[in-house]
């Protein structure tokens, strides 16, 4: 139950059942974690077909209920990793409002849709919108491939930082 690294550790959750998520968060309570991260970004078909990860982006009302419960249960930081939408951005503004209503502490935003996977061009304008709209820091994710691209994209979007995915392994 000790964290020997002296570095913050987050537990990432994926799921749609509120009671299961509540039980999991309570199971984490005795451990020295810095916070809970809700994954709303996974684009894997075997995941989103179960209406979890990026699949939940089709249901902003359900996300609101999950985040309300998490905000109530989590005394540490509550963060969210999400994409700009499932097949398009029709719920994007509503999702940003959900982030504000539930007082999320950090939003990591992948600038593509779930169905866009890793093939489509990232929409960095959505990151700019999120930075202006939410009351928490926003990390940009999507095609951050180097220090140079990270710096350029942070300047372009005003994001507070970047989250590096696949390129972290390649580099």
Please tell me what each predicted stretch does.
Residues 1-171:
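Flavin-dependent oxidoreductase catalytic cores
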């Amino acid at each position: 139950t000790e964290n020997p690294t002296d570095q913050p550790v987050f537990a990432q959750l994926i799921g749609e059942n509120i009671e299961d998520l509540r039980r999991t968060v309570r199971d984490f309570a005795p451990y020295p974690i810095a916070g809970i991260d809700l994954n709303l970004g996974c684009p894997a078909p075997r995941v989103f077909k179960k209406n979890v990860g990026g699949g939940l982006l089709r249901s902003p009302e359900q996300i609101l209920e999950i985040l309300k419960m998490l905000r109530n249960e989590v005394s540490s930081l509550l963060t969210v990793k999400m994409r700009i939408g499932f097949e398009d951005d029709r719920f994007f503004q509503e999702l940003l409002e959900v982030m504000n209503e539930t007082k999320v502490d950090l939003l990591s935003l992948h600038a593509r849709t779930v169905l866009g996977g890793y093939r489509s061009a990232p929409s960095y304008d959505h990151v700019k919108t999120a930075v202006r709209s939410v009351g928490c820091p926003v990390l940009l994710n999507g095609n951050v491939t180097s220090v140079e691209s990270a710096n350029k994209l942070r300047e372009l979007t005003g994001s507070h930082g970047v989250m590096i995915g696949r390129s972290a392994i390649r580099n």
